[in-house]
Swiss-Prot record:
GO terms for biological process: glutamyl-tRNA aminoacylation. GO terms for molecular function: ATP binding; glutamate-tRNA ligase activity; tRNA binding; zinc ion binding. ATP binds at K246. One of its GO terms (cellular component) is cytosol. It comes from Synechococcus sp. (strain JA-2-3B'a(2-13)) (Cyanobacteria bacterium Yellowstone B-Prime). This is Glutamate--tRNA ligase.
Length: 479
């Protein structure tokens, strides 16, 4: 059997991180077995489905590198196909028109709740006569279409993650609506028809869909098809074990992209949410994971989103990038911060900046604040930096550093060539090396913390800004 799986997001919102994890699992399983990975857009909700969400979903999957083999297939373009199946079920007596109003349904649910029963449709219109149907239509009622669910009946399947599962049809809420009054199909019917037509062999999705599975199995059987195999992955919760929400930070793939996570790092982390490779490795490409992916190693327990671990994984991927690659990734973030990248002193300067800050960032979005002093002139100072520069003897030491730097004939500006000059000034000013270095950082970067000082000094000198910043200290010190 040739494996065929699908990811089927609904464009009623941006691509959610949970949907992305489901896409990763489907992609891994398809690649592991040499199968097909189909993208389907479930856009039958006319009120909530929006083109901008569709664009966001497609862009998010593409950014993650989850290439699909077929699609995108849009449900909105298959309405006639669904309506034909609904008519087939009506003709065979497996479905019927239901004229119960929303007010009557609410009254029914209220009575059931008052009696301590679970709310359900009581199938009251399953056996309407033709005269009764005409009477309801004369009132102007528009019927929905309900699929007949036999009760009592046990529906069982062996979930590839959770093992054997059995549902009694008495717990399914009565005959289910499969089409609205306007003819638009509902979720359970549309996905079953699609999965049949697309030859889906494995449905891999979140555990929140377990309750839909028995209904869909009944529809498969009614349409004369064997159901596919099902695998329901655990939900992703926040660190406190509650449903992941916007209060916990980013929840959409686009937000993670804006925060500066690399797609390869985010894919790596998503694969580790509920799954682990046999060798226990935590850093791997999705291609390597595909060779190892198996449902036996998917944990049934809910996964907790761990920001610290994601940040660590991302930092490791950043460190693996070559300087030119890192510059390419950082450029949009620098540009968004308003940095002018066209006026750099030499072709390798940006690469050296990237090399300097690579160890100090977990996310690309952290780069602009860390490297701002290298791109913006005049320099702005933090209050602690100003206090440092106003300490006794510091202004004189900065003036001496400026004089020494101006007189030096450096064959090549580097941290190694600047170090002797710093040592010379420390000795000449009778100043402890630590105090001088701290003061130099304040003068050159406007802060007391940051990347390697001598490397920063060299980059500023190559740009022609170091001398001016040392001389500017005199203006910061009260007379």
């Amino acid at each position: 059997m040739s494996v065929c799986v699908r990811i089927a997001p609904s464009p009623t919102g941006n691509l959610h991180i949970g949907t992305a994890r489901t896409a990763v699992f489907n992609w891994l399983y398809a690649r592991r077995h040499g199968g097909r990975f189909i993208l389907r857009i479930e856009d039958t909700d006319r009120d909530r489905s929006l083109p901008r969400y569709t664009r966001n979903i497609l862009a998010g999957l593409a950014w993650l590198g989850l290439d699909w083999d077929e699609g995108p297939v849009y449900q909105s373009k298959r309405i006639e196909r669904y309506q034909a199946v609904v008519q087939q079920l009506l003709d065979r007596g497996l479905a019927y028109r239901c004229y119960v109003s929303e007010a009557e349904l609410e009254e029914m649910r209220a009575a059931q709740k008052a009696a301590g029963k679970a709310p359900r449709y009581d199938n009251r219109h399953r056996f309407l006569t033709e005269a009764q149907r005409r009477a309801y239509e004369a009132e102007g009622r528009q019927p929905v279409i309900r699929f007949k669910i036999e009760e009592p009946l046990e529906v069982s399947w062996v979930d590839l993650i959770r093992g054997p599962i059995t549902w009694n049809t008495q717990d399914l809420g009565g005959d289910m609506v499969i089409a609205r009054a306007d003819g638009c199909p509902l979720y359970n019917l549309a996905v079953v028809v699609d999965d049949i037509d697309m030859g889906i062999t494995h449905v891999i999705r979140g555990e929140d869909h377990i309750g839909n599975t028995p209904k869909q199995i009944l529809l498969y059987r009614a349409l004369g098809h064997e159901p596919p195999q099902f695998a329901h992955s655990p939900l992703i919760l926040n660190p406190e074990g509650k449903k992941l929400s916007k209060r916990d930070g980013a929840t959409s793939v686009a937000e993670f992209q804006q925060l500066g996570f690399l797609p390869e790092a985010l894919k790596n982390y998503l694969a580790l949410l509920s799954w682990s490779p046999p060798d226990g490795e935590e850093l791997f490409s999705l291609e390597k994971a595909a060779a190892l992916f198996d449902f036996d190693r998917v944990n049934r327990a809910a996964a907790r989103f761990d920001w610290d671990k994601l940040n660590w994984i991302n930092s490791q991927y950043i460190k693996r990038l070559s300087p030119p690659e890192l510059v390419e990734r950082l450029t949009p973030f620098w540009q968004a911060a308003g940095f002018d990248l066209s006026e750099v002193p030499d072709p390798t300067w940006l690469e050296d900046v990237a090399r300097l800050i690579a160890d100090g960032i977990d996310r690309l979005a952290e780069a602009p604040p860390l490297s701002r002093f290298l791109f913006q002139e005049p320099l702005s100072y933090t209050l602690p930096a100003l206090e440092q520069l106003r300490l006794p003897g510091v202004a004189e030491a900065m003036a001496a550093m400026a004089t020494t730097l101006a007189a030096a004939e450096l064959p090549q500006v580097s941290a190694d060539s600047l170090k002797p000059l710093v040592d010379q000034v420390a000795k000449g000013q009778n100043m402890k090396k630590g105090l001088l270095m701290k003061s130099l950082r304040a003068a050159l970067t406007g802060d007391l913390q940051g990347p390697d000082l001598l490397e920063s000094f060299a980059l500023l000198q190559r740009r022609g800004w170091a001398l001016g910043r040392l001389e500017a200290v005199q203006k910061l010190v009260p007379c």
